[in-house]
Each structure stands twice: as C-alpha cells, then as structure tokens.
Amino acid sequence: MLLRMALCLTVSTILCAGFASNLMDILRRPVNQVWDMFEESHLPAGIGLDAWSKAKEMATAMTSLGASQRALFLRQVSPSQADLTEAALVLRGAQPLPEDRKQVFIREGSPSTAVRDLAEALYSKGAVLADGTGRGALKMMSAFQPGEAFMLTIKLSLYAGVVISFPLLLYFLLQFIIPGLLEHERKLLYKCMAVGFGLFLAGTLFCYFIVLPRVLTFFYTYSLEFGISNEWRIGYYLSFATQMILMFGLAFELPVVVMPFVKLGVLTYDMMKSTRRYAIVAIAVLAAVITPTPDVATMMLMAVPMYALYEICIILAWMHERKEAARTREEIARFEEDFNNNNSPYNQ
C-alpha cells in the first residue's frame, strides 16, 4: 500500500515538474490580482487599468524627447490616450512639489482643459504613478540561496502532484480496509471517494479564485497603512498559498466524513439537528484557525461554506432516514401479504 502511494506520488510529481513554469504562473495570478484591484481602486470612473498603464509607459518614454518629437509621438495614438498620457506627465511633474503647490501646478501646467480635468481627477483618487501595472512592487521572484529556485520547483510539483493524484492516493490508502467490507459497504466507500474528490477540488478552486486574493489584499493594504513595503519572497508565498489552498480542500471534505456515519446509523437526523449549535461553534473555531487573517469577512468565507455543507448533511440524513423507513414499511407490508396468503414458513 505505502509503496503504491509513494510510486503514484512520485510519478505525479515528475509529471507536474514538466509544467512547473505554468504552475508558477497559475499560483502568481492571485498576487497580480491584488495589485490590479489596488490600482483600479485608485482610478476615476471611465479610466481603465490598461489605458492608464499604457499612458504611464508612454509618459516615461516621452521624458527624453523634445517638444516637436513629443507632439509627433502623441499623434500616433488616439486623442483620449494622448490626453491621458499628458495627464500622467503633469502628475509626475507635480510629484516632488509640496502638497499645497501640487494642485496649482496641475491647474496651471496642463496644456489643455481636457488634460487638466483628467489630471485633477487622477490626483483626487490618488492614482499610482509607477510604470506599467506596478506589479513589480511585489518582488515575488527574489531567491536568497543558490538552490532555492530548484527546491521551490520540487515543492510546487509535489503539492500539485498531491492534488492531481488525490483519488488514487485515497484509493490505495483505503485498500487496507476494503477487503473486510461487505458489498454494500464497498459501494458506499467508492461513492464517498468520488464525492470526496469533487468536494476537495471545489474547496481548492473556491480558495484560489475567491479567498486567496482577498487574503492577499488584506495583508497588502495592511502593510501599506503602516508604511511597510510589500517585498514578498517567492518561497514564503508559495508555502502560504499552497497550504491555504490544501486546507480549504480538506475542509470541504466535511460531508465525506459525516455521511458514512449516517449510513451506518452512528449519526441520525435528530442528533445532527439537535447539536447544530455546537456544530456552528466548532466550524467557527476551525475557520478562525485555518484562515490566516483576523478579519471576520475572511473567516466567514471559510465558515459559511462549511456550515452550508453541514446543513446539506442534515438534509441528506433526513432523506436517508425517510428512504430507510419507506423500505422497512415495504418489507413489513410484503411480509404481511405473504403471511396472509399462507406463503409464510410459519403457516406450514
């Protein structure tokens, strides 16, 4: 069993290592979203992030050009993009001035009314003036040891291999008890494995697309409030993100843990319904431990889906008991019918 699990994990890790660069891009996506959301929140309505990023890049290129060359340069783009580029130039020119003189420079130094209005709107929103999209502010690729990048690739491939080979690993793990199960118990186990992988995948995707960007945004803005630059090391971020994603995947396994006990009669609908308040407390504590941020909103992103899954378990337990009760009534009715028709062995 252990040998099969080791071989399965080794093969999946080697396969994932061939796509390490793609996996790294996928894992970096939430970080890029953090900066995009931060920069978009500092732009006036009607100005897109791509247009503003292009305007800043063009403004940087124009600093080394003469007046005639600048005019020729701006004629190569649309009038709206040209106005936005000149607004970026005005804002950068005002940047080293005292706060009480910046607005004066913006108002009097703008070449046209349209540029002045754009510059004032951008200034009032606190638009980010760094070149490009500003994602370089998050130094994600810093490595401080010669073999750190290689070890990160191995670690990332291992985490991805665990996710991909999860059904097989679970199957090999359960092979120890499968021979001792009855036929209906085996069928139940296989169903639980299929549902478990689906829930595990749903939990990881939920964390990746919804929870992780929110958590990173919280840490990013929290650091800025204290004047701390966000220079996140790739190794720390990789461990943080992968562990959080895997924890969410495991947390979504709640129905797989509960329903077998319901099927075996250990847990009942009445028992789960009467202990709902204790389940809520346990889920809240677990969510507070797993989520790394202290804010309630992020904790609720973990607690609400888990509680919804618990309620689904209660409904499934109720449906299971109704089904079993109907089956029992049907068997009793069949027995009574056989008894009345003298087909029962007790009448012979």
From Swiss-Prot:
It comes from Akkermansia muciniphila (strain ATCC BAA-835 / DSM 22959 / JCM 33894 / BCRC 81048 / CCUG 64013 / CIP 107961 / Muc). Keywords: Cell membrane, Membrane, Protein transport, Translocation, Transmembrane, Transmembrane helix, Transport. Belongs to the TatC family. It is found in: Cell membrane. One of its GO terms (biological process) is intracellular protein transmembrane transport. GO terms for cellular component: TAT protein transport complex. This is Sec-independent protein translocase protein TatC. PANTHER family: SEC-INDEPENDENT PROTEIN TRANSLOCASE PROTEIN TATC, SEC-INDEPENDENT PROTEIN TRANSLOCASE PROTEIN TATC, CHLOROPLASTIC-RELATED. Part of the twin-arginine translocation (Tat) system that transports large folded proteins containing a characteristic twin-arginine motif in their signal peptide across membranes.
